């Protein structure tokens, strides 16, 4: 299982817009055949910080995800909302 944890920091006045933009990516992602989990988490201490927990069955499923319209649209819209680049950490999922 291929797991990615993404940290996204957005401008404080863009939190609601971020949630709506990312909702579309979430709804599309959970429909993908290779997607096992796609959680959008908001930091309770920093309202403008989000974590995305993505689990896919393999790297091919991740590669497919990055070709989808919902992913491409989301990434394009995120640029103006973020305070800096996304931070990604990769993991091998052992026990889902």
UniProtKB/Swiss-Prot annotation:
Enzyme Commission number(s) from the entry: 5.3.1.32
Keywords (A to Z) from UniProt: Cytoplasm, Isomerase
A Gene Ontology term for the protein's cellular component: cytosol
Biological process per Gene Ontology, one example term: quorum sensing
Inducers of expression: In the absence of AI-2, repressed by LsrR. Induced by AI-2, via release of the LsrR repressor. In the absence of glucose, induced by cAMP-CRP by direct binding to the upstream region of the lsr promoter.
Catalytic EC class: isomerase
Principal subcellular localisation of the protein: cytoplasm
Entry's localization field: Cytoplasm
Family: Belongs to the LsrG family.
Subunit annotation: Homodimer.
Protein name: (4S)-4-hydroxy-5-phosphonooxypentane-2,3-dione isomerase
Organism: Escherichia coli (strain K12)
Gene coding for it: lsrG
